[in-house]
Amino acid sequence: MSEMTPPQIVSELDKFIIGQEKAKRAVSIALRNRWRRMQLNSELRYEVTPKNILMIGPTGVGKTEIARRLAKLADSPFIKVEATKFTEVGYVGKEVDSIIRDLTDAAIKMIRIKNIKKNKVRVEEIVEEKILDVLVPTPKKNWTESEKNESLAKTIQTFRKKLREGVLDEKEIEINILSTTMGVEIMAPPGMEELTNQLQSLFQNLGGHKKSSRRLKIKDAIVLLTEEEAAKLINQEEIKKEAINAVEQNGIVFIDEIDKICRRGDSSGPDISREGVQRDLLPLVEGCTVSTKHGMVKTDHILFIASGAFQTSTPSDLIPELQGRLPIKVELQALTIDDFEKILTEPTASITAQYKALMETEGVYINFTKEGIRNIAEAAWKVNESIENIGARRLHTVLEKLMEDISFNASDNKGNTIEINSNYVEEHLDQLTSNEDLGRFIL
């Protein structure tokens, strides 16, 4: 797992997310506490449970982006789910237990990739030798032993050099590789994904592990042989054991749109997609044991981070038991014009940098002036205020409208530099921001 300190985590998040310091601090402390807990003795470690987080804020302010970036920093099993996809146990739809099954599958994949990387050098050596065995002919029988060895060594070195330089990539060779059985696609109702996976595994294993001779280009043969040899060096049972332990000790679940499963005060009758889902989530968040195809997984020490806009409801509309299991509540602020301006320029791979790079592929060079950036930010903020506040996502809509003519006529402007200044922005966005009805239609 990641050993980054809270300031380091916040610093990394700052590269992609503008503002929202409280939320960044909360998730960075929670992530660091995962590492701190692992340094304790086993008896005390069991008693220390994670403090789950509820992030509250309007749409488009960075809740989901924080989770997405946190997943890359965590180096721990991580899964993001939408609360609206689940229904109460006994009804058609995904059950909440599938969250832990999916998290375990993600952990298996993560541990498997780590093991493959660990064995990368060894696998490359084995694959190289197998390719050379096919490429290098056997010396003639009437040669002396020393002549054979000398000739063989020279030939092998020659081919090894060419192979490493990629000179032989297009050359075709005949090799024996494991034959893959025909894939079987099984359609199943929601909530029966586990059974579907088991049936697919059964059909895939029916063909056994037979080898077949295939004629392939060397570059394609290397890919197939690498997969085959990497699989041989992996102990599947050890991976399962390690993955389950990683999930139980360091797993992180991000539940988005949790406000959509709040039961409104004026509703009546059974509510299978709201309060029932909350009650099903309780055992997971509090700690229970879930059965997966890889083994039993305990959820006692999994960190849950929930988020929601709560525009038509409030956190108090969640059932009290669930509120109590999300003790850390962080409010994210609505974005200002200054925030929009920073979002356009400061993050790594900012929106403006993306548009510049896209246009440069056609030889068109875009230059955004400081005044132009400010005008774009003001336009996005104005549309948000007058129509519907969708946060930073509005910038994509505004910039797409602004760049429409340039994108359409890019091939005619090859070699030109186009400056997007205050006048250009006003000319192309003035009608959009001044006419509310037109704005509603376009956006």
Swiss-Prot record:
InterPro entries per UniProt: AAA+_ATPase (IPR003593), ATP-dep_Clp_protease_ClpX (IPR050052), ATPase_AAA_core (IPR003959), Clp_ATPase_C (IPR019489), HslU (IPR004491), P-loop_NTPase (IPR027417)
Stored Pfam families: AAA (PF00004), AAA_2 (PF07724)
Known role: ATPase subunit of a proteasome-like degradation complex; this subunit has chaperone activity. The binding of ATP and its subsequent hydrolysis by HslU are essential for unfolding of protein substrates subsequently hydrolyzed by HslV. HslU recognizes the N-terminal part of its protein substrates and unfolds these before they are guided to HslV for hydrolysis.
Domain of life: Bacteria
Entry's family note: Belongs to the ClpX chaperone family. HslU subfamily.
Record-linked CDD domains: RecA-like_HslU
Annotated source species: Buchnera aphidicola subsp. Acyrthosiphon pisum (strain APS) (Acyrthosiphon pisum symbiotic bacterium)
Subunit structure: A double ring-shaped homohexamer of HslV is capped on each side by a ring-shaped HslU homohexamer. The assembly of the HslU/HslV complex is dependent on binding of ATP.
SUPFAM superfamilies: P-loop containing nucleoside triphosphate hydrolases
Taxonomic lineage of the native organism: Bacteria, Pseudomonadati, Pseudomonadota, Gammaproteobacteria, Enterobacterales
Example GO biological process: proteolysis involved in protein catabolic process
Protein name, per record: ATP-dependent protease ATPase subunit HslU
Record-linked PANTHER family: ATP-DEPENDENT CLP PROTEASE ATP-BINDING SUBUNIT CLPX-LIKE, MITOCHONDRIAL-RELATED, ATP-DEPENDENT PROTEASE ATPASE SUBUNIT HSLU
Intracellular or extracellular location(s): Cytoplasm
HAMAP family: HslU
Sequence positions that bind ATP: 18, 60-65, 256, 321, 393
